[in-house]
């Protein structure tokens, strides 16, 4: 097996995603003194079908925007003279700056409680959760960026308890992706028994454990130990078996930050973002020094303050982050089966969310973005470390800019393709006097996508990134980015890509079958012969609640439901047992 230099190709991939076209607009002023405005033809027809009549509005001539070049895929062309009122977003002091920047860039207005009615907003995005009363009072045209009840997944002790319950209910074969875990202080006796039993079996060989505070994040309060006398804890902690054989790149430990968006729990709908972050420790992995956090912890909040952060490190280069696409390019350069790894990650995400999904209360018009932290060991097995609530969207480096700005863009596209499809939404907006409907349509655009489920995303996962980025551009239009591409090109062409990635990974990689062709983006071969797929779908069309979710929005790919059986098992209540059976079938197929 031999490697190849991925620096230039990887750099061109990263920069390719930044080459955008800024839309040009011209201003048309109607010449008639008494100008009459009619709703857009497509929208008016749908509102008439819903039994809502909108009288023509008369008034002063209104400047209108005529598009020369579309920044997004459009559901339909807007007629000249259509009134476009911007959507409104609401924030608090915790709202990430990149979210506000992206929304303003897309033409949204920021909510001003001094000048606007209390309900005159479309999206409320903040870091903290919402009270149930806030969920209950949300209007049909509004969206919240959190779902109630999801902290059961993001507290480390709760996650461990729920996954332990799922393992007990459905067997260990599916739930082998979490390290052996004990919740302190309740499991203290069990941990002590396990520790000394293992110590007796291993003899002089060391075993390693990691102790984490249940509620803290960003690597705070973490202790790694081998000797029991070093084990100290107070309050709520978890103790896990430390993965002592991580996949090393340039002898540095890394983990993956995978972004997952759940657009609804009833019915359950899960999307996985096919780009993400790879976070590196900034000092070389060394089990003989467990106190060196820069060698054992990959949290960027820790490593960006380390002495080696600015250095050009072997293979990794400058800083402590790669894009996920660069990481998979590195694996492919050594003939590692990255598609199989993606399947395992998708399955892990589904099984993890299934652990809490039945107990999550119903709430309309909300979504949840999770950050899954996953470690790959030297056998290419993915391990779930934790799930993060409100994953950090700060822009600390050029890699953050590349990933997180487009992530926010794609979340907005995803939510306004799926979140506003509920039956009667447009009619309700018009009835309540919300005049933001047209702007919602122009911002989120439309996506030429089938009305049915795309493919079995776990048994046939496509490569999201390959050497030809044009595939991505054909599938989804690239939206304008605020940061100038030339500025980022200068950053990305420097130290971040200074070194060749020609080093054998510290692993035993599974080779790709010679008979397995490399797949390109979105081979959406539907599994449903009983569903007639339409050639074009407008996000504004009133639809029934049994409609299959959109297969993709930007880099978000639907992973659940993944076939007709799981679609049915998630509609009228959540049939977890049936879903588990379908997942087990896929595992059996992959192993056969």
UniProtKB/Swiss-Prot annotation:
GO BP annotation list: microtubule cytoskeleton organization; protein modification process
Site (described: Essential for specifying initiation versus elongation step of the polyglutamylase activity): 218
Polar residues composition bias: residue spans: 7-23
Binding site for Mg(2+) 1: 373, 386
This protein's record includes keyword 4Fe-4S: no
TTL domain boundaries: 84-427
UniProt cofactor(s): Mg(2+)
Residues annotated for Mg(2+) 2 binding in this entry: 386, 388
Tissues expressing this chain: Testis.
Molecular function per GO: ATP binding; metal ion binding; tubulin binding; tubulin-glutamic acid ligase activity
Domain of life of the native organism: Eukaryota
List of residues binding L-glutamate: 279, 301, 321, 404
Designated name of the protein: Probable tubulin polyglutamylase TTLL2
Pfam families tied to this protein: TTL (PF03133)
InterPro entries documented for this protein: TTL/TTLL_fam
Domain comment in the entry: Arg-218 is the main determinant for regioselectivity, which segregates between initiases and elongases in all tubulin--tyrosine ligase family. A glutamine residue at this position is found in elongases TTLL6, TTLL9, TTLL11, TTLL13, TTLL10 and favors glutamate-chain elongation, whereas an arginine residue is found in initiases TTLL2, TTLL4, TTLL5, TTLL3, TTLL8 and favors initiation.
Keywords: ATP-binding, Ligase, Magnesium, Metal-binding, Nucleotide-binding
Binding annotation for ATP: 212, 218-219, 240-243, 253-255, 298-299
Keyword Nucleotidyltransferase among record annotations: no
